[in-house]
Amino acid sequence: MTMWPLSCGGRGDPHTATVDEFRDEFAAALRAGWAGFAGVLVDEGEIAVPAPDGYRPHRLRAKLEYRGGPFGTVTVEVAPEEVGGLTRVEEIPARDAADWFAELGLPTPQPVPTLPLAHQIAQKLHACTTPDDRAWVNERAHDLVDLQLALRVYTGSLAEIRDVAVRLFTARGLHAWPPLVTARQGWKARYAAEAVGLDVLPTLEDAVIWANQLLAEINASEE
């Protein structure tokens, strides 16, 4: 999963929009259309997950059409920037997409701005270790798949992940660093479904052991 966060800034910089501004500008862009595509934005509101007030992710669905006919629906989740995540935005070249666009006669896509991978990893470590409460059960088994794939392409240091993670856990204040991954009921089936066709550990048990070893290595790392 590629993440593009939002900060609490204002208009003028595409990387520093509020959730409301992003929604309004996204809806306007869909109405205006691009290369035969257009769409309508449906706002589904905040996602019910444990998070400090003002930092819960927001779910939008873009219902797309192409040249007047139905094309598909894309789910977009946005969240405010945390712990300096936008200080250094990373860009991913859209190489595969560029080939597809060329075959379809569409304009060449620009590089995709993303949340730095160290921040994405820290957020997923936080998400899959967040304790349950009376109103919410942690179902984030899929993060164990995402983490394996992310670590495979991550080129930074474990110390960088630790720095981000410590600040993130402190800012959110939901549970302490370092955490432990604990499997919940239903995780085994969810992990198996998410892992289909991917080069990741075959069982949930293996993935939990791997994730907790990773957490120990990150916590022991130093700059």
Residue map of PLM features:
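Structured mid-to-C-terminal alpha-helical surface segments
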Residues: 2-8, 13-223
